[in-house]
Swiss-Prot record:
InterPro entries: P-loop_NTPase, RapZ-like, RapZ-like_N, RapZ_C
Residues annotated for GTP binding in this entry: D57, T58, R59, T60
Family: Belongs to the RapZ-like family.
Keyword tRNA processing: no
Keywords: ATP-binding, GTP-binding, Nucleotide-binding
Role summary: Displays ATPase and GTPase activities.
Transmembrane segments: none
UniProt GO molecular function: ATP binding; GTP binding; molecular adaptor activity
HAMAP family: RapZ_like
Annotated positions binding ATP: G8, L9, S10, G11, S12, G13, K14, S15
Organism per entry: Deinococcus radiodurans (strain ATCC 13939 / DSM 20539 / JCM 16871 / CCUG 27074 / LMG 4051 / NBRC 15346 / NCIMB 9279 / VKM B-1422 / R1)
Family annotation (SUPFAM superfamilies): P-loop containing nucleoside triphosphate hydrolases (SSF52540)
Protein name as annotated: Nucleotide-binding protein DR_1434
Tagged with keyword Protein biosynthesis: no
Length: 283
């Protein structure tokens, strides 16, 4: 994996690019002067860290004079050295700054700052392997471009959580589903004290064609929602599945979804059966 130097104009998306690399497992250092690039290489190499990304921009302008010798030395030591430079037109940068209300690192009027910044960073742009114009890119699109550029796998996990509505829906769920229309094992005395993890309870929940149809449509909806979340750049998506008490139906549905979605292309895990009690009725 490469040693990546990320640079570019303020507001062009450097933070998004760094965050994308960090989420992909890179060791990240922001605002590192060129004079310290080689020291960083020594540090991470000594600790066996292979995936490294650093950013350098006009916040370290006092040190940019050391750019060329630092780059030449590092490029001789790292055959996998990559330089990514981000830019955008002045109007878009101005709009982004107006939204963020941040002060430009050069501290002058913004349009003057942008012109001066381009001048200061011209040497970095000149050594860049890749220049990305983010004028027409959203943060999610830029993240996808960075993932593609470095051939990174986008880590995504679908998390399932069963619960009982009488205990309140989970606050951290991205999507809450109601499965109370499924057959309720609570009304079968032989099943009441069991949980939806047990085969005879699950068989009761999915006992007829209507229940199977309901489950099939629910699974398709969950899978579609997860795929769209992954495509948008999300790294996780939490689905809460609720019945009345959180003991039977929601547990059975969550367990079945877990088994079937794990066999698909979506990494799926069970967070918790929040309100289930093994060997007893739900509280």
């Amino acid at each position: 994996m490469p040693f990546v130097i990320v640079s570019g104009l303020s507001g062009s998306g450097k933070s998004t690019a760094l965050r994308t690399l960090e989420d992909a497992g890179f060791f990240i250092t922001d605002n590192l002067p060129p004079e310290l690039w080689n020291a960083m290489h020594d540090l991470v190499t000594a600790r066996g860290i292979e995936n490294v990304a650093v950013s350098t921009d006009t916040r370290t302008r006092e040190f940019l004079a050391a750019l060329e010798p630092s780059y030449v030395r590092l490029s001789r030591r790292r055959e996998d050295l990559r330089v990514l430079f981000l830019e955008a037109n002045a109007e878009v940068l101005l709009g982004r700054y107006n939204l963020s209300r941040r002060e430009h690192p050069l501290g002058e009027t913004l349009m003057v700052d942008f012109a001066r910044e381009r001048e200061l960073l011209a040497p970095l742009r000149g050594i860049a392997d890749t220049v990305i114009d983010t004028t027409d890119l959203s943060a999610a699109q830029l993240s996808q471009r960075v993932m593609h550029l470095f051939r990174l796998e986008h880590a995504f996990t679908l998390r399932l959580l069963s619960f009982g509505f009488k205990h309140a829906p989970p606050r951290d769920a991205d999507l809450v589903l109601d499965v109370r229309s499924l057959p309720n094992p609570y009304y079968d005395e032989t099943l009441r004290s069991k949980s939806g993890r047990q085969p005879d309870v699950a068989a009761y929940v999915f006992r007829d064609a209507e229940a199977e149809q309901f489950y099939g449509e629910l699974r398709h909806f969950v899978q579609t929602a997860a795929e769209r979340a992954r495509a948008s750049g999300r790294h996780s998506y939490t689905v809460g599945i609720g019945c009345t008490g959180g003991q039977h139906r929601s547990v059975a549905v969550a367990e079945r979804l877990l088994r079937e979605l794990q066999a698909s292309s979506i990494e799926t895990e069970l967070m918790d059966h929040r309100d289930m009690r093994e060997g007893g009725e739900p509280t």
